[in-house]
Amino acid sequence: MATPEKTESAKKFLPRIVEKRWDHHLEAKIFDQWQEEGTFTVKPGKGGKPFVIDTPPPTTSGTWHIGAVASYSQIDMIARSQRMQGKPVLFPIGFDRNGINVEIYVEKQSKVKMRDTPRQQFIDLCSHALDELEGQMINMMKRVGLSGDYDGKYHTDHESYRKLTQATFIELWKRGLIYETTRPNNYCHECGTTIADA
């Protein structure tokens, strides 16, 4: 049973947590050192057969939600564990620079409608916005410490990437692995088109 004295002293006790602030500039210095040393860049011919991670390129939206950070952190753990075993690791950083998300973003930011804007002008607006958003995303990726190959980044709107995906599609078609069928799709009435499941 508590005595009145203890109850009074308990009332007077006000615990305080002395806040220790983490200097995030320290993280930037460490990451810059890793970049300078080429820690995340694949060095062909060193360490044997490279370990390759096929990363899904995030949509270039400028912001990274916690789910994306969690997913890429899991990929990053695999990349780091393979490096710790002495393997050269190809962990490419890519950006999906196509799709409705980009078009909607540009329409809102530029206050224009895609259908009312000359095609090349709208493509230029998208390209400029994507470059800006990509820079923001790279900064976020670096802030969370992702160990991807930033020097070898790729874009889904680059000609070489499109040629590769088209050649792959044709090869799969020739093998009979591509088929056409009817299935339910997500449809956006506002955009007037189907949208991805993701």
Model-inferred region functions:
Residues 2-198:
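N-terminal, positively charged nucleic-acid-binding surface of large information/translation enzymes
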